[in-house]
């Protein structure tokens, strides 16, 4: 009884102290940012209680519609400025203020990997980790078969459809996830796992991304950590994360033994061996950098985890949402098929590579519109200002958390006109991939380093799939293409009828 009383008394004193601090003390960041428009706050919690914990992006976008392209929030003890719109984001992250906005804001829940992974590290070390990945997904390497997309895509259709004229594919988004896991495990670890392990990994990644998209209260008020731990345990997010990390650790142990036995890095290599080294899985390149003293050992595990999580979930969900759009709008499928056939004089489409994408302008417009309409990440991981800066007439203090509102940026009528909520590829007619105004891979120095992977996967899959199949809705109910909130938007399950073309 005395213990319970002590805990209650301690919490009460802590809360009262925070209220007094909030009312009586005005820190530098708060003093500067208070002139930026935004909703009124309450002591200690700020605007935290005004946020929908299950749909943080919607809450942010609702505030944008009320307060404009630059507005202020205070969630708990954290000062936040939200930016919306192509011009504002471009100015801050790509142009005038690029250097000021390039650091990642490390939230409480990301603290574990802050010095070790691509996602949350800062400074020169971040660019070392990032550089190892980007060196492996250059356009040249992707075009030369660095990804074995075609092989895995054709295997998927062969297994699902066999020799049937029509095949009902149950839970199509899950089949896309399975394909993405197979591809990314081959790309990062150089392995082809059995189906049982693949299905477990699919479920673990899905669990992590669904739960991680929910509001984590201790990111803004650390004393609420016990509440979040209870929620995370219920959602199995912690056990799922460590399952993936341990899985990678086993593969890394095998690589360590291999290098110790063969001592490959100390021997002169023939041209043939050099060629093989250029195509080794990414985890081996991280391990080589560890042996050179460039990175920590734990950075291999954390970075490969980052790559697998991001590539599988955002890529597969984005593509599944696109399939849903194509089912709802069969006329777009027809136009894509016509373009494929115009370019397929030698009946060689199944061997297509990303190098061919410029020959398919309509497919590029469909991809651009998909990136706009179905932003895989509606609210990006936050950055922070490294010095005071003026944006859109408002002064933002050094150390402020910066959030990019991609849902509003990509779907607001203010930027895209009255038809902003329509899926309309023609708005990107004759424009290149990654058209100006799209920030689906983020922006600036911290833009997603795996963007080319997603583009290559999407283009290759789209061409092979629609060359060989027409995709039809087996019911009269349109596919739900809005997605559910997660760290990346989650495509809801749907069935699709794949009809072989002649």
UniProtKB/Swiss-Prot annotation:
Q: Which is one Gene Ontology cellular component term of this protein?
A: membrane
Q: Keyword tRNA processing on this protein?
A: no
Q: What is its EC number?
A: 1.14.-.-
UniProt keyword list: Heme, Iron, Membrane, Metal-binding, Monooxygenase, Oxidoreductase, Transmembrane, Transmembrane helix
Which segments cross the bilayer?
4-24
Q: How does it sit in the membrane?
A: Single-pass membrane protein
Which Pfam family, an example, fits this chain?
p450
List residues binding heme. Answer: 448
Major subcellular site = membrane
GO-annotated molecular function: heme binding; iron ion binding; monooxygenase activity; oxidoreductase activity, acting on paired donors, with incorporation or reduction of molecular oxygen
Protein name, please? Probable cytochrome P450 514A4
Which organism was this protein described from? Dictyostelium discoideum (Social amoeba)
Q: What gene is behind this protein?
A: cyp514A4
């Amino acid at each position: 009884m005395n213990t319970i009383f002590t805990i209650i008394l301690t919490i009460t004193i802590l809360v009262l102290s925070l209220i007094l601090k909030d009312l009586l003390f005005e820190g530098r960041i708060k003093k500067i940012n208070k002139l930026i428009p935004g909703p009124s706050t309450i002591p200690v919690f700020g605007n935290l209680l005004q946020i929908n914990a299950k749909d943080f992006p919607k809450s942010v976008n609702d505030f944008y519609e009320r307060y404009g392209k630059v507005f202020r929030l205070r969630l708990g003890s954290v000062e936040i400025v939200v930016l919306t719109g192509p011009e504002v984001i471009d100015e801050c992250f790509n142009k005038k203020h690029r250097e000021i906005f390039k650091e990642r804001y490390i939230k409480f829940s990301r603290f574990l990997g802050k010095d070790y992974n691509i996602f949350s590290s800062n400074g020169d070390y971040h660019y070392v980790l990032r550089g190892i990945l980007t060196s492996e997904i250059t356009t040249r390497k992707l075009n030369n078969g660095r990804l074995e997309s075609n092989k895995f895509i054709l295997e998927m259709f062969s297994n699902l459809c066999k020799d049937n004229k029509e095949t009902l594919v149950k839970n199509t988004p899950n089949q896309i996830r399975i394909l993405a896991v197979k591809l990314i495990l081959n790309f990062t670890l150089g392995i082809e796992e059995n189906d049982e392990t693949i299905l477990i990994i699919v479920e673990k990644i899905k669990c992590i991304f669904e739960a991680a998209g929910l509001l984590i209260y201790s990111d803004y008020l650390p004393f609420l950590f016990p509440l979040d731990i209870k929620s995370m345990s219920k959602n199995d997010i912690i056990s799922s994360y460590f399952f993936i990390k341990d899985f990678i650790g086993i593969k890394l142990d095998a690589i360590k033994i291999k290098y110790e036995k063969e001592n490959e890095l100390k021997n002169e290599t023939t041209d043939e061996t050099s060629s093989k080294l250029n195509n080794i899985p990414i985890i081996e390149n991280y391990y080589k950098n560890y042996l050179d003293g460039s990175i920590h050992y734990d950075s291999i595990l954390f970075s490969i985890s980052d790559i697998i999580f991001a590539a599988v979930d955002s890529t597969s969900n984005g593509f599944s949402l696109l399939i849903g759009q194509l089912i709802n709008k069969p006329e777009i499928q027809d136009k894509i098929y016509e373009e494929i056939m115009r370019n397929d004089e030698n009946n060689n489409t199944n061997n297509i590579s990303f190098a061919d994408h410029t020959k398919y302008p309509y497919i590029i417009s469909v991809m651009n519109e998909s990136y706009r309409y179905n932003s895989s990440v509606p609210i990006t991981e936050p950055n922070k200002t490294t010095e005071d800066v003026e944006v859109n007439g408002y002064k933002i203090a050094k150390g402020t958390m910066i959030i990019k509102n991609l849902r509003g940026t990509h779907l607001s009528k203010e930027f895209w006109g009255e038809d902003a909520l329509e899926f309309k590829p023609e708005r990107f007619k004759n424009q290149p991939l990654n058209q100006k105004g799209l920030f689906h891979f983020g922006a600036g120095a911290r833009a997603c380093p795996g963007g080319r992977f997603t583009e290559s996967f999407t283009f290759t899959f789209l061409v092979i799939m629609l060359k060989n199949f027409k995709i039809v809705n087996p019911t009269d109910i349109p596919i739900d293409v809005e997605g559910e909130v997660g760290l990346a938007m989650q495509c809801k399950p749907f069935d699709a009828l794949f009809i072989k073309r002649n």
